[in-house]
C-alpha cells in the first residue's frame, strides 16, 4: 500500500510541449472538420453550419482547416511513426483486446509507451488523413478533374470520415472516461508513476532503467 501511495506522488514526463502542441493542433482542426463536414454533407446536420459561421464561410474554411490538419498529421507521422510499428506482443494484445475493455490489462502483454490499440489508431489516422488530403484536393478543385474521379474522391472522403471519425470517438472516450489520468498527460505532459506502471508497465520499466 505504501509503495502504491509513493508511486501516486511521483510524476513522470510522458509528452513534450511540442508533442502536446501537434496533438491539440490535429484534435482541434479535426473537430472543426468533423462538424463542418457533417453540416455540409447532410441536410439533417445543416444547423451546425449556422453555429460555425454559416454555410458559405464553412465551405470556404473547411478545406483550409483540412490543410492545417494535414500539416499536423504529417508532423505526427514524423514524430510517432516508428513508435507505432506493431510487434508480436501488439498482435497478441489486439487478439485479447476484450480484456482491455474490461479493465483486465494484467491479462495482456505489457504495453510500452503506446499500447497496440493506440498504435492501430495512429495508423488509421495516418492512412485516413492521406485519403482525406488527396480526395479533398480533388473535391476542392473539381473542374480540374474528370467527373468520375470527383465521384470517387467523394466516396473515399466519406469512407475515411466514417473510419477516422469512429476511431476518434473511441480515442476521446478512452482518453477521458475509459482510462482516467490520460487526458492530463496531454495537458501537463506528465502522469503519475502509478498510472505509468499500471497502464504502460514496459515503458515504465524502461524509464526507470529496469527495461
Language model regions located:
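Membrane-embedded alpha-helical bundles that constitute the cytochrome b-like, heme-associated redox core
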Residues: 1-211
Amino acid at each position: 500500500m505504501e509503495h502504491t501511495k509513493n508511486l501516486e506522488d511521483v510524476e513522470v514526463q510522458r509528452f513534450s510541449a511540442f508533442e502536446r502542441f501537434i496533438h491539440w493542433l490535429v484534435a482541434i482542426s479535426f473537430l472543426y472538420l468533423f462538424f463542418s463536414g457533417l453540416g455540409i454533407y447532410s441536410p439533417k446536420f445543416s444547423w451546425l453550419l449556422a453555429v460555425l459561421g454559416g454555410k458559405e464561410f464553412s465551405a470556404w474554411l473547411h478545406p483550409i482547416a483540412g490543410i492545417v490538419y494535414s500539416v499536423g498529421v504529417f508532423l505526427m507521422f514524423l514524430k510517432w511513426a516508428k513508435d507505432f510499428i506493431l510487434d508480436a506482443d501488439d498482435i497478441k494484445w489486439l487478439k485479447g483486446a476484450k480484456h482491455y475493455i474490461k479493465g483486465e490489462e494484467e491479462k495482456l502483454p505489457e504495453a510500452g509507451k503506446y499500447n497496440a490499440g493506440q498504435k492501430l489508431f495512429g495508423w488509421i489516422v495516418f492512412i485516413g488523413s492521406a485519403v482525406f488530403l488527396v480526395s479533398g484536393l480533388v473535391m476542392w478543385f473539381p473542374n480540374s478533374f474528370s467527373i468520375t474521379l470527383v465521384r470517387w474522391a467523394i466516396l473515399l472522403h466519406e469512407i475515411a470520415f466514417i473510419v477516422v471519425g469512429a476511431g476518434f470517438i473511441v480515442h476521446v472516450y478512452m482518453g477521458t472516461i475509459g482510462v482516467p489520468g490520460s487526458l492530463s498527460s496531454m495537458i501537463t505532459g506528465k502522469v503519475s508513476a502509478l498510472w505509468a506502471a499500471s497502464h504502460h508497465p514496459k515503458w515504465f520499466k524502461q524509464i526507470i532503467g529496469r527495461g
